[in-house]
Amino acid sequence: MEVTFFGTSAGLPTKERNTQAIALNLEPYSNSIWLFDVGEGTQHQILHHAIKLGKVTHIFITHMHGDHIFGLPGLLSSRSFQGGEQKPLTLVGPKGIKAYVEMSMNLSESHLNYPITYIEIDDHLTYHHDGFTVEAHLLNHGIPSYGYRVMAPETTGTINVEALKNIGLEPGPKYQEVKSHDTFEHNGQVYQSKDFRGESKQGPVVAIFGDTKPCSNERVISRDADVMVHEATYIDGEKHLANNYHHSHIEDVFALIKEANVKRTLITHLSNRYNTEDINEIYQILIQNEDTPNFNFVKDFDSFKV
């Protein structure tokens, strides 16, 4: 899988950064793209990338602030003409997301040529699709804001060839049945496939956060995540300033990384007060501390393998 950022600024765009938008490429598990938040100008950002709107099957909105949703109506309209015709879309988000989209379409007399399934979250959500499990949990941002825990399908354990040979089953097409089915038959006897496979391995876990100040659900969402995408609107200065506005400070994120045993953290939603030079200088200062966990300040069009 791969995470790509189409917008990394907080609140307002800058000359260097667009407002929030993240793409999650599900390959090799699926040929689909999932978007998380669609800030103003997202569809224009996507034009500079190989991702096609027709491959976007799901959009997850973290919360209803404008820097996370103002690009949604335009992107949905353009999807009709960029490979999305008759391809269903699932839109997940807080209560009000359906009304927002439908009102925008109605008032602009825009017409989509594909169906949308709306899923509005009430406190929390567990959603299953193509072997993936997505959990949404409420954060603390003053308005309903959610974090998403995306769990890829389990990888089936390796076939124990010697054990199969011991029952007289030599390598061949039957091995695929052992790998992909719960049971298989050989010489008139039914066997449990799990007895001839190694332990299954949980697929990668990606945690993607909406805006929030520290809260207990953060640890639920990010526990043992392979990759965490988290906001740090404030990356210097006093922490209470961030928390007073229901946002996170870089110190909050570092604490969460350690508490939740996160392997890699990608920090986005940086205040427009910081330019690229500021961010690079702060990064160099932070990594001088041996206690600083593994993280990156991301910029628009950055991509990271999961």
Swiss-Prot record:
Catalyzed reactions per annotation: Endonucleolytic cleavage of RNA, removing extra 3' nucleotides from tRNA precursor, generating 3' termini of tRNAs. A 3'-hydroxy group is left at the tRNA terminus and a 5'-phosphoryl group is left at the trailer molecule
UniProt: Zn(2+) 1 binding residues: 63, 65, 141, 211
Keyword Cell inner membrane assigned: no
Record keywords, A-Z: Endonuclease, Hydrolase, Metal-binding, Nuclease, tRNA processing, Zinc
Pfam families in alphabetical order: Lactamase_B_4
Active-site residues, as the UniProt record annotates them: 67
Entry-linked InterPro entries: RibonucZ/Hydroxyglut_hydro, RNase_Z/BN, tRNase_Z_dom
Catalytic activity, EC: 3.1.26.11
Cofactor(s) essential for the protein: Zn(2+)
Record note on cofactor: Binds 2 Zn(2+) ions.
UniProt xrefs under CDD domains: RNaseZ_ZiPD-like_MBL-fold
GO MF: 3'-tRNA processing endoribonuclease activity; zinc ion binding
UniProt superkingdom: Bacteria
Binding site for Zn(2+) 2: 67-68, 211, 269
Record function comment: Zinc phosphodiesterase, which displays some tRNA 3'-processing endonuclease activity. Probably involved in tRNA maturation, by removing a 3'-trailer from precursor tRNA.
Family note: Belongs to the RNase Z family.
Oligomeric and partner information: Homodimer.
PANTHER family from the UniProt entry: ZINC PHOSPHODIESTERASE ELAC PROTEIN 1
Protein name: Ribonuclease Z
